């Protein structure tokens, strides 16, 4: 299973960061009425190892009618949740894909997560993982370099990424190991997680 991004039609709900700049988001201290508790918005943050299936998980969420934002810097999470909790925002279920390319912000990630929850948003963190051997095989079969390998090997990049993301994996609400998953297995697992949380 490769972590590839499928093309999006003009009617799709997928938004990449470059598609949303400049982003006009209401300031968090604006005097806007909160969303009633019965309509409390939901946010899913998708992160994890490169090649583990982040984009496939995002596709599954999009198929479940979630609004998906790709490549979101973590510091924008509180502003997005603030937008969601205002009446008339129109977005009540949002999935944000955060990857290691935003690594300079991960040291502050827990603070951003706390602010999102303080804004009145139900937030869940899903971490995608796979074994080193599987990740190496996926990168080699796709003939793409690992984003962190530099002049080293794919395995060097994977080891560096594990060091950067180890803390996030430890605090994730759900960890999905896709080592033995097909694309359909991952989509089914994401559907199960969303359905389970909705029933609680």
Q: What residues fall within each predicted segment?
A:
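C-terminal accessory "lid"/substrate-recognition subdomains
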Residues: 2-32, 156-200
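Post-Walker A alpha-helix
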Residues: 57-58
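Short glycine-/polar-rich loops that comprise or flank the Walker A/P-loop
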Residues: 64, 90-93, 119-124, 170-173, ...
